[in-house]
């Protein structure tokens, strides 16, 4: 069963919600279900939940005036609570911004230009990946809540575990797709047609490349055919792109590996030879290492259910290399957006406060009991 939890301080919207849910109760199937609950919420104004205690979405409602005030007094940083909730429950986050549509950008709302409010809303979407829904008034907000609630109750919400390991085929498709012009569809065909080692060794004749077709029986694009033929002839730039598609091997590392030799040279050598390659970094020189070397040999020789081997030194299916975590990569990637020191401190403070209360549900979501109060105090301060 799905249900909506509304914060008891949402006095202006709750009457409309009660009316809207009353109409929903006319449905015989939902007649005896308590779809709307009014409680005190500590994060957000509304929670869309699934029985027994799974949080699917958290919604914060603000008028333009409230939004402007939050920018001035610092309550805008309260979004960290919502971000922490999403981290713990994998729920979706929404901001309802209430007010007339498209006012003049220079119009002052609570002494804040509307253009500044739009900028803050854009940052919420781009930086924090929070959905923004604009509404006209309280009644319209209630309607949008009902639409959102109905969509969640009818759609299967599937949360993919972040630790899900991709299959060999998926990784090999990604490898082929590192080449410009090769889509996931063509990448899958290549992954199950030949190995990279097969191509760079010239064992896939150009006439065979010319006969490759898509699932719709159309020939490969001419650009892709020329690129595959150039790889078979030892084009170093394309070899670097292919090698960079191997897990934990980026473009810089691939270029360093192929600095003095072609890709085929390493595929014809024992794995130990590749593992001993010296990689020059800014302050030191390191070896490529056995794990990366095994990954290179494994994925460049992978072909469908049966890999095409170049020599007896290649590793077997049973010894598939364990992918190194992101922290072990040679070239680390900086986050797209850096969180401010103040926001980080707020998030850390919230995380430490919530750590002792954290209880995981069997599905991997957090229970909602920590985000609502069992008893509502009549003296609770208004938002």
From Swiss-Prot:
One of its GO terms (biological process) is symbiont-mediated suppression of host type I interferon-mediated signaling pathway. Coiled coil: none annotated. GO terms for molecular function: 3'-flap endonuclease activity; crossover junction DNA endonuclease activity; DNA binding. Pfam families: ERCC4. Residues 336-367 are annotated as: Disordered. Keywords: Host-virus interaction, Hydrolase, Inhibition of host innate immune response by virus, Inhibition of host interferon signaling pathway by virus, Interferon antiviral system evasion, Late protein, Viral immunoevasion. This is ERCC4 domain-containing protein EP364R. Residues 357-367 have a biased composition (Polar residues). It is an enzyme of class 3 (hydrolase). One of its GO terms (cellular component) is Holliday junction resolvase complex. It comes from the Viruses. InterPro entries: ERCC4_domain (IPR006166), Mus81 (IPR033309), Restrct_endonuc-II-like (IPR011335). Belongs to the asfivirus EP364R family. Its EC number is 3.1.4.-. Induction: Expressed in the late phase of the viral replicative cycle. Plays a role in the inhibition of type I interferon signaling pathway. Mechanistically, specifically interacts with 2',3'-cGAMP and cleaves it via its phosphodiesterase activity. In turn, prevents 2',3'-cGAMP interaction with host ER-resident STING1 leading to inhibition of downstream signaling pathway and type I interferon production. Residues 347-356 have a biased composition (Basic and acidic residues). Residues 3-101 form the ERCC4 domain.
């Amino acid at each position: 069963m799905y249900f909506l939890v509304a914060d008891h301080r949402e006095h202006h919207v709750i009457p409309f919600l009660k009316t809207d849910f009353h109409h929903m109760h006319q449905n015989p199937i939902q007649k005896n279900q308590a779809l709307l609950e009014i409680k005190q919420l500590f994060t957000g104004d509304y929670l869309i939940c699934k029985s027994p205690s799974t949080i699917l979405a958290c919604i914060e409602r603000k008028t333009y005036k409230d939004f402007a005030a939050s920018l001035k007094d610092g309550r805008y940083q309260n979004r960290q609570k919502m971000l922490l909730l999403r981290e713990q429950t994998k729920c979706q986050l929404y901001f309802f911004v209430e007010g007339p549509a498209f006012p003049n950008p220079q119009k002052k709302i609570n002494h804040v230009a509307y253009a500044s409010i739009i900028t803050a809303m854009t940052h919420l979407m781009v930086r924090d990946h929070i959905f923004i829904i604009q509404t006209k008034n309280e009644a319209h907000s209630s309607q949008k809540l009902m639409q959102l609630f109905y969509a969640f109750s009818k759609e299967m919400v599937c949360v993919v575990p972040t630790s899900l390991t991709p299959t060999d085929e998926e990784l090999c498709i990604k490898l082929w797709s590192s080449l410009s012009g090769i889509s996931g569809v063509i990448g899958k065909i290549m992954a199950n047609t030949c190995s990279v080692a097969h191509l760079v060794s010239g064992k896939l004749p150009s006439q065979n490349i010319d006969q490759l077709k898509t699932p719709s029986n159309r020939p490969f694009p001419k650009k892709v055919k020329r690129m595959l033929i150039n790889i078979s002839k030892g084009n170093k730039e394309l070899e670097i792109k292919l090698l960079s598609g191997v897990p934990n091997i980026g473009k810089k590392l691939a270029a360093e590996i192929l600095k003095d030799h072609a890709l085929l040279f390493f595929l014809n050598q024992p794995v130990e030879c590749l593992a001993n390659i010296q990689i020059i970094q800014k302050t030191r020189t390191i070896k490529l290492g056995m794990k990366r070397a095994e990954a290179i040999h494994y994925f460049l020789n992978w072909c469908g259910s049966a890999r095409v081997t170049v020599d007896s030194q290649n590793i077997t299916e049973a010894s598939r290399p364990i992918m190194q975590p992101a922290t072990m990569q040679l070239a680390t990637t900086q986050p797209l957006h850096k969180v401010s020191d103040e926001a980080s401190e707020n998030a850390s403070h919230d995380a430490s406060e919530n750590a002792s209360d954290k209880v995981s549900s069997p599905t991997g979501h957090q229970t909602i009991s920590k985000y609502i109060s069992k008893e509502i105090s009549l003296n609770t301060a208004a938002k």
